[in-house]
Amino acid sequence: MNKRQQAQLGDAFAADGLCLDLARQLADTFDQARLQQIQGVLDSPVAQRFSEAERAVGEDGGAALASYRAQLAQRPPREERLALVQRLDGAAHTSELASLLRYEVGKTQALLALMARGDSLDEQALSRQTASQATALRASSVEAVESFMLYAYRQMPSAQLAAYAALYEQPAVALLLERCVQVLPQLFAERRALLRKAAKR
């Protein structure tokens, strides 16, 4: 891939542009009042407390989280606590979005590897070639997300964890996240189409 193609790749997959296109797609589903309702939920004191706990995990470079994960096999969490984390993960679509993004990035990398050899695949063929990765990515994402949540929220009472999950179970928030899951593959596919088009020039 030459420098011009590298620049096109950077432009196509820039986070700001991806987020903007996602927002445009979602704008057809949500009116301003509903968006304000969702924003209010995600900016609530409960949500802010959990966001702060998540950010704190990275303050030591993730060393404590890595140590915690190493101990999980010998010291598994209480079943009811794990169930709450799984409820939150399901409501927030965290594992689903994480595995989806990893899969779409992997598909793009596979396409770039083909293009570097002068080959290419259309979107359907690329999906068939990479489909076997999806299950493994899903399993590893679930494991990573659950262990992260168990560690990040370890000092949060279960009642607060349940309240946090309930925020994501509100209909407007749930619909927003479901639409994100639906739209993201389309946005990545559109960007891969641009890469194919650029490679033919």
Residues covered by each model-derived region:
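Second-shell loop/turn segments in exported
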Residues: 7-13, 22-26, 37, 72-75, ...
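A cross-kingdom marker for long, charged
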Residues: 138-201
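Soluble non-cytosolic domains of exported or imported proteins
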Residues: 12-17, 29-32, 45, 79-82, ...
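Surface-exposed patches in mature extracellular/periplasmic domains of secreted proteins
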Residues: 26, 34-39, 50-54, 99-103, ...
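Extended amphipathic alpha-helical interaction segments
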Residues: 59-154
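N-terminal Sec/ER secretory leader and immediately downstream segment
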Residues: 1-62, 195, 201
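Outer-membrane beta-barrel domain signature
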Residues: 53, 58-66, 70-73, 77-78, ...
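Extracytoplasmic/secreted proteins, especially bacterial periplasmic and envelope-associated proteins
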Residues: 4, 17, 21, 25, ...
